[in-house]
Amino acid sequence: MQWVGLLAVSLPGVAALAALLFTWRQVGQTSIELRISEQGQITNRYNAAINNLGSQSIDVRLGGMYALQRIMQDSTRDHPTVVSVLSAYVRQHAPLPASGANKSQATSEGKSPDADIQAVINVLAHRRPAFDKGTTVDLSRTDLSGLKSMGTGTINFREADLTGADLRGADLSNADLSLASLFGANLTQATLLGTNLRGAHLNNAILTKTSVCGTDTFTDPETGKATYFCPDLTSADLGEAKLNGASLAHTKLTGAYLTHADLTDADLTGADLTDADLTDADLRNANFTGARLRGVTLNGAKVEGARGLPSSSR
């Protein structure tokens, strides 16, 4: 009987297929169980780290912070939560004093954040922002005066909220602060060498005597010219900012908004102010020698004693 023969021939294949399907289901089930187990381990690690943040011991708290950093590296799903937790830690443990010291232009010489605050800032600075998933690093109204260098590599605070933060004497060298909110922040005597502030919002910010450019130069590989280590303030909003006495020599301020800004006694030698808006700005005794001023708007600006401005502005 032909069908009996066909059945006999097909049975081994059917059995093999059944075995394959069973194995596939087992592998799938094992994979699901493994993911559940891994997620459970991360949850346990997260809970332990959070508990450590509440410890009285600085060493235990630091351990908790670095444990959260490892969780960010191991779990992209938990990355945004960790960013929010660490940001909240800074806001809770380093708030502005009730006196509102961020409005003062006094220096913060000798002052620096506690070790745990510095550590949290370092962790946030070196996270992978691609996994933030819309979460903002919210350090608004915090006291970060005297913040030390955050090391080498990528220092990313792009689009961070630093509204009203006290950053007097902070070292923000080479940090990416593009599109960051720095409304009313105090950056008196802060170091901004090589900082990217492109499109940042600095309305009412205080940058008195801020170190913006270094005295050293490097050779630009594209142009072959000597270039200063200066921040990029292209299109930055500096409306009503206090920049009196600031060292802004060779700074890129292309298209920047400086309406009503206080630039008295500021050094802007060699700065690029192409298409910048300086309407109603106070430019008295500022030095614009060698600055690029094509397309700059100076309507209503106070220019008494300013050097390097076109005669038509007087």
Regions found by a protein language model. Name each.
Residues I71, Y89, R127-F131, T142:
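TPR/TPR-like alpha-solenoid repeats
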Residues Q92-P95, H126:
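Membrane-proximal, non-transmembrane interaction modules
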Residues M1-R91, P310:
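Membrane-proximal alpha-helical anchors
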Residues L68, L86, I117, I121-L124:
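Hydrophobic core/packing positions within alpha-helical solenoid repeats
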Residues K133-R314:
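Tandem repeat scaffolds
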Residues L6-G13, R25, D59-R61, D78, ...:
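Positions within the helices of HEAT/ARM-like alpha-solenoid repeats
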